[in-house]
Amino acid sequence: MKASRSSIPVFKLYGENQAWPTPDLLHCESIPKRSSLHHWEIKPHRHADLYQLLYVQSGQALVEVEGRREDVREATIQVVPPLMVHGFQFSENIEGYVLTLGAPLVAQLESQLGAPLAVLAAAGRYPVGRDRQRLNSLFKTLLEEYEGSASA
C-alpha cells in the first residue's frame, strides 16, 4: 500500500529533526556517511525547501522519486527538487556524494545569473559520461571545502 503524501516525513537532512546544521545554505557529504547509518537505505521522504543532487560515482543505487524506481549502475547525477518524495537503496560499495542546496541559495544564484536554473526545477537523472573525472574532482573539492569550513 502506498503511503499518503501527508504521512511522508519532511526533513531538513534525512533522519535529523534539528534545524539546518550549518550557517551556509549548502551541505555536502559522502553517500556512505549517512546511508551506512541507515543500513544503506534512505526511506521515502521529502524536503520543504531544499534541492538535492545525488552523485553516484560507482556502486549501485535504487533511486525512487515520486514512486518511480530506477536502478543506477553507472556514474549519474540525480536531481531532486523541493517537496519531491524520494528514497534510495544503496549497495555497500557505493561511492558518491549528496549536495544539498537551500532554496534561498538557488534563488540567489538564479538572480545573479539572470535566469532560472531549469535543471533544478524538475527531477531528472543525468549519466555523467565523459565529464566523470571533472565531476569527481569538483565534488571532492566541495566536500573538502565544506568539511573544512564546518570544523572551523
Task: Pin down the residues of each PLM region.
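Generic protein-terminus/edge-of-domain signal
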Residues: 1-64, 70
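A cytosolic small-molecule/anion-sensing beta-strand core signal
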Residues: 57, 73-74, 92
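Short acidic-glycine-tyrosine-enriched beta hairpin
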Residues: 67-82
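A conserved hydrophobic position in a structured secondary element of the catalytic/binding core
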Residues: 80, 101, 130
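Short acidic (Asp/Glu) patches
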Residues: 80-84, 120-122
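Ligand-binding loop in jelly-roll beta-barrel domains
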Residues: 83-105
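Double-stranded beta-helix
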Residues: 104-124
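Amphipathic alpha-helical segments enriched in hydrophobic/aromatic residues interleaved with Lys/Arg
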Residues: 117-152
